[in-house]
Amino acid sequence: MKIIAKIPAWMLLCLFTLSPITETIYTSGLPSITEYFNTDGSTTQITSSLYYLGFALGILTLGRLSDIYGRRPVVLFGLCIYAISSIISIFAPNIETLMLARFVQAFGVSVGSVIGQAMARDSYQGSELSYVYASLSPWLLFIPSLGSSIGGYIIEYSSWHYTFVFFSLTGTVLLTLYCKILPETNPYINFSQTSKYFEVLKVVIRDKSLWLYAFIIGAFNGIYYGFYIEAPFIFIDKMKVAPSFYGKLAFLLSFAGIFGGFLGGYLIKKRHIHDQKVMILGLVFSVIGCSLLAIDALILQDKEVGQNIAVIMMFAPMMLHMVGHNLLIPMTLRYALEDYAKVTGTAGSVFGAIYYVLIAAVTFLVSKLHSDTIGNFALLFLVLSVSSAAAFYYILILYKKKLT
């Protein structure tokens, strides 16, 4: 595949992290939003499920458009939608309006994921692409945790409305900056018109490995974001932790993610360990972490422990999972679409839509399991982690059949 321009890694980072930081800042304010609109926590959490559905719709449509019209104009369009919907959210008179605005906000910000990944594949190939993903992934976890800290301070010292002020300003700044310096990386603009979109769609839908990769990404990100939408109610509401301190706790997950990312990069670049072995190691970390989380959550339901001990019992297992997350997911993204180089945007849009629908389903389940007990979501996470390991095992079987 020819390369016409390379998007700098820092610009990819901005695209990749815009949605995660938006969601983690927002989730810090879920208890406050629940109180403001005089509703229940389960209803408020559904705003996150709708966010991921809007994200899935954006990925499905905007990825296709980037194949036809180019990556750059679609990114600028998405950032514009993101900024406008954030402004609307500030003045939402009820929870239903906020739900709709969040859906539209997610549709716009989805360009950061689907177009960002397409631009990465346009710009880098092979082991260089793996290294770029592995190098960026620690920051993909650090910055969202920074979002929890920012959100915690905003909620503690002002109100949830100012989180959307932050989003609208961020979107406007990025839109202005990218209008000036964002390169066009798609070397096959209009290619998808001759390749026939529905023929590509048919191939993608029949690709078993792609569906399994989508399940793994959806499950792991569902665990990640599911924890973020449940954690504020556990720590701020139940344990009476200050919102700003809760934001600081989120950095524990960042440190684990950074370690996992650097470990993955080291194993690939310095030790020349095959990507598949790195992915298996990631699954091992995740299953162990989610198992411990389920055990600890069940213990906390039956026994009274100190606040500090309870925090450790909840965050330490999640840190193990996050190490595994950052060992596995970058490589999953690298391999899932390697056979779709000329239709990366189209294939990526279908792929991304699948796993974001799964993320929406997981967060919806978390909202439905939301109760006075904290063991429900932890058991769900364990099921998802083990199921992901089974899915990856089946991918290896399909890969071996492909070689023979």
Swiss-Prot record:
Cross-referenced Gene3D superfamilies: Multidrug resistance protein D (1.20.1720.10)
**GO cellular component labels:** plasma membrane
Supply the alphabetized keyword list: Cell inner membrane, Cell membrane, Membrane, Transmembrane, Transmembrane helix, Transport
Example GO molecular function term? xenobiotic transmembrane transporter activity
Under the heading SUPFAM superfamilies, the entry gives: MFS general substrate transporter (SSF103473)
Q: What Pfam family does this protein match (any one)?
A: MFS_1
Q: Where does this chain mainly localize? A: membrane
Q: Which residues cross the membrane?
A: 3-23, 43-63, 73-93, 95-115, 135-155, 162-182, 216-236, 248-268, 280-300, 309-329, 346-366, 377-397
Where in the cell is the protein located?
A: Cell inner membrane
Membrane topology designation? Multi-pass membrane protein
Superkingdom in the source lineage: Bacteria
Checking CDD domains in the record gives: MFS_MdfA_MDR_like (cd17320)
- Where does this protein have coiled-coil stretches? none
Where is the secretion signal located?
Answer: none
GO BP terms:
xenobiotic detoxification by transmembrane export across the plasma membrane
What PANTHER family does its record include?
Answer: MAJOR FACILITATOR SUPERFAMILY, MAJOR FACILITATOR SUPERFAMILY (MFS) TRANSPORTER-RELATED
Q: Which NCBIfam families match?
A: efflux_Bcr_CflA (TIGR00710)
Family per UniProt?
Belongs to the major facilitator superfamily. Bcr/CmlA family.
Q: What is this protein called?
A: Uncharacterized transporter RBE_0856
Source species:
Rickettsia bellii (strain RML369-C)
Lineage runs: Bacteria, Pseudomonadati, Pseudomonadota, Alphaproteobacteria, Rickettsiales
